[in-house]
Amino acid sequence: MTAEKITQGTEGLNVPNEPIIPFIIGDGIGPDIWKAASRVIDAAVEKAYNGEKRIEWKEVLAGQKAFDTTGEWLPQETLDTIKEYLIAVKGPLTTPIGGGIRSLNVALRQELDLFTCLRPVRWFKGVPSPVKRPQDVDMVIFRENTEDIYAGIEFKEGTTEVKKVIDFLQNEMGATNIRFPETSGIGIKPVSKEGTERLVRAAIQYAIDNNRKSVTLVHKGNIMKFTEGSFKQWGYDLALSEFGDQVFTWQQYDEIVEKEGRDAANAAQEKAEKEGKIIIKDSIADIFLQQILTRPAEHDVVATMNLNGDYISDALAAQVGGIGIAPGANINYETGHAIFEATHGTAPKYAGLNKVNPSSVILSSVLMLEHLGWQEAADKITDSIEDTIASKVVTYDFARLMDGAEEVSTSAFADELIKNLK
C-alpha cells in the first residue's frame, strides 16, 4: 500500500486506502490526548478493514511547539500542508499573548475558509449530566465560522482608528445612539447572503443525507433586523429555491394559515412530515436556549451564526457531559478542506499528567472517519465509547460524578476503548 493525498473530485472527496492526514498535536494536554486518540483510531481502522486501509499521520506545527521550533505561532508551511492534503486533526491550541494573531483557531478557520463549525451533540448512556433527560438531546449544530462579530473587525477605545469609525458613524451615517462615544470600543458584525446560503445549504444537505427531521435557523432577527434578520430570511429563501420539493418551511405554514386557516396549515405540515420532508423552522436565540433545556427533542439540525453558535454548542455540551466529550469539526463543503478538533482548551495544569479525558478529540476523529466515508471504523469507536462508559471505566472528570466508577488514566482509557472494539 502506498500512502496518498486525499483529493477533491466533482462528487466529493477521493479517499485512497492509505490517506496521508496532517495532525497538530496541540498545546498543554494535547500530547496526552493525541497519543491516546491516535492509538484508538489506528486500532479501529485495522479492526474494521483487516489491514486493507490505514492512515499515515503527518505532523504539522502550530501553537507553542511551532513557536518554540520556528518562532511563528502558525507557520505558513502548516497552512500550505493542510491546504494540500485537505483534511487535518488538531488538539487544543494556546492563544498567543500580545499582539498579532488573536486566536490560532480563528486564524486557521479564516485562512482555510472553513465556514462551518460542525458540533454534533448527543448523550452517551452513563455519562453524568445535570439535566433529567439528557437522552432527549440529539442535535447537530452548524455554526457559521467566518463572519458575524467574530470576524475580528474591532477598534480599541481611545485609538485613532476608533475615533475615525465613530466620527464616520455619527457624521456620515447619522448614528445618534452611541451612548458614550468618547470611551467606546467598536466591533463590526458582517453577515452576508453568500455566507448564510452556503451554511444553510450544508445544514439542509446534511439533514437530508442523514435522515434528520428538521433544520432550525437560530437568530436574533427581532433586534438585529439587517444582519440576523437577513440570515433568517436568506435561509428560508435558500431552502425553497434549492430544496423546494424536499422541505416544508414555517413561512409556507404561515402563508397557508393566512389563506386557508390553521387546521389546513397543520395538515400540510403533517403531510410533509409523513413524506419525509425536512421541516425548516426558526427560533429567536434566547427562546432557543430555553427550549434546549425544556424540550430539546423538538430540535434536530441547527443552523446559526457565529456568536449564537458558540453559546449554543457549549450550552448543549454541558447537558450531555461537558466539552470533554464534545466533538467538533471545521469544514468547507465546497473545497473539501476540513479540520477535526478537540473542542476544549489546553488545560495546562494537567499537561503531562496522563489524566484528562481524550474523548473530545477521539469523537472528533470519528467525525473525520465519517467524513472520509469510513463509517465502519467510526461506528466501532462510537460503540466502544458507549460500552466503556457504561461499564464505568472512565477518566477522573466522570469518575468523580459516578457511583462505583473505576477511575483510569488517559492512556488506560484508550487501552479500554481498544479492548472494547468489536
From Swiss-Prot:
EC class (word): oxidoreductase
This protein's record includes keyword Membrane: no
Cofactor binding: number and manner: Binds 1 Mg(2+) or Mn(2+) ion per subunit.
Entry binding sites for D-threo-isocitrate: 103, 105, 109, 119, 143
GO MF term set: isocitrate dehydrogenase (NADP+) activity; magnesium ion binding; NAD binding
Site (Critical for catalysis): 150, 220
Cofactor entry: Mg(2+); Mn(2+)
Top-level lineage group: Bacteria
UniProt keyword terms in alphabetical order: Glyoxylate bypass, Magnesium, Manganese, Metal-binding, NADP, Oxidoreductase, Tricarboxylic acid cycle
Positions annotated to bind NADP(+): 94, 344-350, 357, 396, 400
InterPro entries registered for this protein in UniProt: IsoCit/isopropylmalate_DH_CS, Isocitrate_DH_NADP_dimer_prok, IsoPropMal-DH-like_dom
Keyword presence, NADP: yes
Residues binding Mg(2+), per UniProt: 310
E.C. code: 1.1.1.42
Catalytic activity entry: D-threo-isocitrate + NADP(+) = 2-oxoglutarate + CO2 + NADPH
Entry's Gene Ontology BP terms: glyoxylate cycle; tricarboxylic acid cycle
Family matches, as Pfam families: Iso_dh
Alphabetical list of NCBIfam families matching this protein: PRK07006.1 (NF005425), prok_nadp_idh (TIGR00183)
Assembly description: Homodimer.
Role: Catalyzes the oxidative decarboxylation of isocitrate to 2-oxoglutarate and carbon dioxide with the concomitant reduction of NADP(+).
Similarity annotation: Belongs to the isocitrate and isopropylmalate dehydrogenases family.
Protein's name in the database: Isocitrate dehydrogenase [NADP]
Protein source organism: Staphylococcus aureus (strain MSSA476)
